[in-house]
Curated annotation (Swiss-Prot):
Keywords: Cell membrane, Cell wall, Membrane, Metal-binding, Secreted, Stress response, Transmembrane, Transmembrane helix. Its main location: membrane. Confers resistance to heavy metal ions (e.g. cadmium (CdCl(2)) and copper (CuCl(2))) by chelating them at the plasma membrane of root cells, thus stopping their entry and reducing their accumulation. This is Protein CADMIUM TOLERANCE 2. It is a single-pass membrane protein. One of its GO terms (cellular component) is extracellular region. Belongs to the CYSTM1 family. It comes from the Eukaryota. The chain crosses the membrane at residues 24-40. GO terms for molecular function: metal ion binding; metal ion sequestering activity.
Length: 55
């Protein structure tokens, strides 16, 4: 039997960028806003994504 492939780490910014490319700006902004809502804080990474997701 073969071992499964190693897990690839994706940064939060990479994940938001991927969502923007796949689903569009509105989806990426909502995804970012909901992430901040779920963790009950606004992190610097979230602000960077919100500022850059529509560029």
């Amino acid at each position: 039997m073969y071992n499964p492939p190693a897990q690839q780490d994706m940064s939060y910014y990479d994940h938001c960028t991927k969502r923007h490319e796949e689903k569009g700006c509105l989806y990426a902004c909502i995804f970012t806003a909901l992430c901040c809502f779920c963790c009950y804080e606004t992190c610097e990474c979230c602000l960077d994504c919100l500022c850059c997701c529509c560029n």
